[in-house]
């Protein structure tokens, strides 16, 4: 785990802020991954829970997740733009007036954090990994994912899917029990 985190941090520093195209590519790969593995996902959820309806699982785990990933893909360009703000609204009136006369300008520049840790709960094991992943990738971050140990079949499939679609420098899945989760959250 620590080696993966070091690698992701190193590459974040070396490669700087990811482009719009790379962010959209990562989101596209998530969508393609869901489309390719949708039957296996539902089978694993059935194995883990034993009583999930395939239709409701398809709606909650696959379709709603594709919807949130598509939403992120459609809006990532807008979310990346710098946001202009009025200058010095918190300053006293004379200073605010002087600063505006001098032509000061303010903006918010959105930048990625680097590597984000994502610990998923057991109840919606695919949706609660990939829906937040949409905003994580849209923001330009890399991710380390710890799926729930209470859904072992789905966690193993999640690891397999991510190994196929992503390099560990972009997204890594760490499986294991409570001891792994404790070590993961302490990174």
Language-model segment annotations:
Residues 81, 90-187:
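Rossmann-like NAD(P) dinucleotide-binding subdomain of oxidoreductase/dehydrogenase enzymes
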Residues 1-105:
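N-terminal Rossmann-like NAD(P)+-binding subdomain of aldehyde/semialdehyde dehydrogenases
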């Amino acid at each position: 785990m620590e080696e993966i985190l070091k690698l992701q941090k190193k590459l974040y520093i070396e490669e700087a802020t990811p482009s719009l195209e790379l962010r959209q590519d990562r989101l596209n790969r998530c969508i393609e991954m869901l489309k390719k593995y949708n039957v296996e996902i539902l089978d694993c959820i059935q194995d883990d829970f034993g009583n999930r309806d395939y239709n409701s699982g398809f709606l909650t785990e696959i379709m709603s997740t594709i919807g949130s990933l598509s939403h992120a893909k459609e809006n990532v360009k807008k979310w990346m733009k710098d946001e202009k703000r009025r200058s010095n609204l918190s300053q006293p009136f004379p200073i605010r007036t002087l600063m505006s006369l001098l032509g000061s300008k303010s903006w918010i520049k959105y930048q990625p954090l680097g590597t984000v840790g994502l610990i998923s709960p057991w109840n919606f094991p695919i949706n609660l990994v990939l829906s937040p992943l949409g905003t994580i990738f849209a923001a330009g971050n890399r991710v380390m994912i710890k799926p729930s140990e209470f859904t072992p079949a789905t966690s193993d499939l999640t690891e397999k899917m991510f190994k196929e679609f992503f390099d560990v420098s972009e997204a890594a899945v760490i499986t294991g029990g409570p001891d792994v989760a404790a070590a993961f959250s302490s990174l």
